[in-house]
Amino acid sequence: MSLRLFTDHCVPNSVTQELRDAGHDVFVLKEHIPPESDDAVVIAKAQELNAVLVSLNGDFADIATYPPSQYKGIIALQIRNRPEVFPLLMRRLTNYLMAHSEMPSYEGRLFLVEAHRIRIHK
């Protein structure tokens, strides 16, 4: 089974392609709304598409602003100004997505993907 994912403008095209190559349905922000759209518009579009949001935007990791229980799922990639960890982070994410490929596994959860772990908040 594949996941429905919505990548925002911060996510490199290579990541989008890697997710597609893994068999996931990936929607790209710039194909649906302007790249400069407010965060609220971005997450609303993910909801409208019934997709898990994938973002490098740290604002989506704020559970006070974006309570996980209100969304189909948020995957926040935690680079923290360390681009050298990006390959490790992507490997961790793709391995996790392969092992957990059903949408209900993501609903109402925030996934903080770091190079050496994934933290999950409900």
Give the ranges of each region predicted by the language model.
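Short secondary-structure boundary segments
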Residues: 9, 56-59, 79
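Acidic, metal-binding active-site segment of PIN/NYN-like and related structure-specific nucleases
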Residues: 47-65
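Glycine-rich nucleotide phosphate-binding loop and flanking beta-alpha elements
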Residues: 13, 60-62, 119
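Active-site donor-binding loop signature of nucleotide-sugar glycosyltransferases
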Residues: 31, 79, 115
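N-terminal first-folded block
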Residues: 3-52
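Charged phosphate-binding loop/patch that engages nucleotide di/tri-phosphates or the phosphate backbone
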Residues: 95-122
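Mid-chain, well-packed structural core segment of small domains
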Residues: 61-93
